[in-house]
Amino acid sequence: MSKITEQIEEIIQPVLDDLNFELVEIEFTKEGKDHFLRISIDKEGGVDLNDCTLASEKISEVMNEEDPIEQMYYLDVASPGAERPIKTDKALHDAVEQPVFVSLYAPIDGSKEWLGVLQSVTDDHIVIKAQVKEKKKEVEIPRNKIAKARHAVLI
């Protein structure tokens, strides 16, 4: 996480806590000449448009007071969607028995990407049941080798 996104998280987390929303992800990017602050939120049962609108209004208020971003930017508050990132230990444990996609820093069994159902999580590793060719295979992945993880939709 960059310094600016850490600063933004400190500012908006109390607002989201008051609204009973979970902060899933913060992204501050430049696209062309425009800057975007994208914030993904969630709650038990999922968020809808009204939730995103309410959170956007409250976040705008505190961001205008604190003003941590020098340049003009567009604020986008949204649901993380079906393929939401898995960034915390809690989110990883909550994803057990669900489809996940994991990118690795280094290959395991010849692959740096694994798609399958998360079977278990420990402090040191995760186990994914993945489809390899015609059969299912359990793959043990050390947690320190995981570059990114997200929920997945299996078809």
Swiss-Prot record:
Q: Which SUPFAM superfamilies match?
A: YhbC-like, C-terminal domain, YhbC-like, N-terminal domain
Top-rank taxon, per record: Bacteria
Q: What coarse category fits the chief subcellular location reported for this protein?
A: cytoplasm
Q: Tell whether Cytoplasm is among the UniProt keywords.
A: yes
Recorded hits in HAMAP family, A to Z, give:
RimP
Described purpose of this protein according to its UniProt entry = Required for maturation of 30S ribosomal subunits.
* UniProt name for this protein: Ribosome maturation factor RimP
Upper lineage ranks?
Answer: Bacteria, Bacillati, Bacillota, Bacilli, Bacillales
Q: Which gene encodes it?
A: rimP
